[in-house]
C-alpha cells in the first residue's frame, strides 16, 4: 500500500522522490519491492557468510540492474560487516557485531555490482545507541582504508545518528560527507 500512497503523492510534483527498502533480508523481498515500484533497495546479507552475502547481493543487483536496463533506474545498497543494535527486525548484540574488513570491500563491490556499500565501523542502530556513557568506539582507520580502496564510491554509515557532535567533524575529515549532521550533544 505504501508504494501507491507515495505514487499518488508525487503525481503533481517535480520533486525527486526515492522509495527505499531498508534491510531487506531476502531476494524475494527485494524483488517484490522493485516490482512494486521501489527505486532503491538495501539487501542486508551481513548475517550470512561472506560468500553467501556476495551471492545474495549479486542476485539482487543483477535483478535490479536488469530492471534499470529496461528504463526504470533502481539502486542497490549492500552491507558488509554487522552493526550492533536494533533496527526493523534486525537485532545484533555487541558480541555478534563485526567491523567491515577493509580487505574485502573491493572484492565485494566488484563481484556484486552494488551501487553503494553500508559499512560497520562502530556506529549502532536504534534505541540501543542511546545508553548513557556508551560513546561509539569508531574505527576511523577502517573508514580511511575503505575510502582509500574505494575512491569516490558511495559509502553508507548506518546508525550515524549515534555519533557524538565532535565525531561528525572527525568523520568528515576522514572522507565522510555529513555536512549537515549535528550528532548527539
Short names for language-model regions:
Residues 1-14, 23-154, 165-180:
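Alpha/beta enzyme core
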Residues 185:
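Short, glycine/polar-rich helix-capping loops at beta-to-alpha or helix-loop-helix junctions
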Amino acid at each position: 500500500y505504501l508504494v501507491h500512497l507515495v505514487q499518488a503523492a508525487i503525481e503533481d510534483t517535480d520533486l525527486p522522490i526515492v522509495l527505499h527498502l531498508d534491510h531487506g533480508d531476502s531476494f524475494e523481498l527485494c524483488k517484490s519491492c522493485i516490482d512494486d515500484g521501489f527505486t532503491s533497495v538495501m539487501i542486508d546479507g551481513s548475517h550470512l557468510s561472506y560468500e553467501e552475502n556476495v551471492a545474495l547481493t549479486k542476485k539482487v543487483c543483477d535483478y535490479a540492474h536488469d530492471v534499470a536496463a529496461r528504463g526504470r533506474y533502481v539502486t542497490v545498497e549492500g552491507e558488509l560487516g554487522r552493526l550492533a543494535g536494533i533496527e526493523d527486525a534486525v537485532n545484533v548484540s555487541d558480541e555478534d557485531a563485526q567491523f567491515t574488513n577493509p580487505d574485502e570491500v573491493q572484492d565485494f563491490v566488484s563481484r556484486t555490482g552494488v551501487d553503494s556499500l553500508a559499512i560497520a565501523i562502530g556506529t549502532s542502530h536504534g534505541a540501543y545507541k542511546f545508553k548513557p556513557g556508551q560513546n561509539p568506539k569508531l574505527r576511523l582507520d577502517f573508514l580511511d582504508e575503505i575510502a582509500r580502496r574505494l575512491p569516490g564510491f558511495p559509502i553508507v554509515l548506518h546508525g550515524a545518528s549515534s555519533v557524538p557532535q565532535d565525531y561528525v567533524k572527525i568523520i568528515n575529515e576522514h572522507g565522510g560527507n555529513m555536512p549537515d549532521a549535528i550528532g548527539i550533544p
